[in-house]
Structures are given as structure tokens and as C-alpha cells.
Amino acid sequence: MLIYLLIACDRLEDKQEKKLRQNLPELQAALQAYAEANAAYDVILINECESDDCEDWQLGISQPVTRNTHLNFPVDLFNGLAEQYGIDCEVGYIEDGAREPVSYFGKHEGKGEVFLIAEYLGL
């Protein structure tokens, strides 16, 4: 199964959007480092932040998983980013090129739990 985790960039209040814009370089660097360190596991960086409108941004990773234990590292990464930068995250699967969200977690949604996310994904 191909999953994705994205930083929630839509429906942000002005204050949240400003903070996201300020932290964008650090977030991109952290995700780039994770993708490069896990390239052997086919982790791919999703970095579509060219638009002037935050709501159109897509920033995160995708990676194949076959067991719930494969979710530990990416969920830990995004939980850490959520805590450090005050963001929320979206997790889901990719099927036929389309992203299907299954859960949200982070600063406002609460910490992401690997077991629950695995259940939502059907792992």
C-alpha cells in the first residue's frame, strides 16, 4: 500500500498561515532529510509549494508500507514536526494516483497513534 503524510495547509487561520510560511524552509529541510535518509525504502518527498496561496500547497512524503510497524518512523516524524511547529497533519493512501485521507493528527487534532492509523488504513 502506498501511503502519504502531508502537512495540513488548508483552512488555516491567518496566524497559522503566517507561522507556516515562516517555518516552510525548516519543514522542507526536515522532510527532504527524511526522504533522502529513507530513499532505499522508496520514500518520496512531496513538495508542491509554488503557489502564493498556502491552501494549494502539498508538503509531505509518500512511501510504501506493508505492515503497521512501517508507520512508526513517518508518524513519529510528523508528530515531532507538529509539536515543534504547531501544525496538523493528514495521513491517507494513494490509489490510482489519487490521495484518499483517512485521519488527521497534530497540534490541534491530537497526537498521531500508529495503531489507530494502521486500522484506518486497513493494515
Language-model regions, residue ranges each:
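Charged interaction segments
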Residues: E48-L123
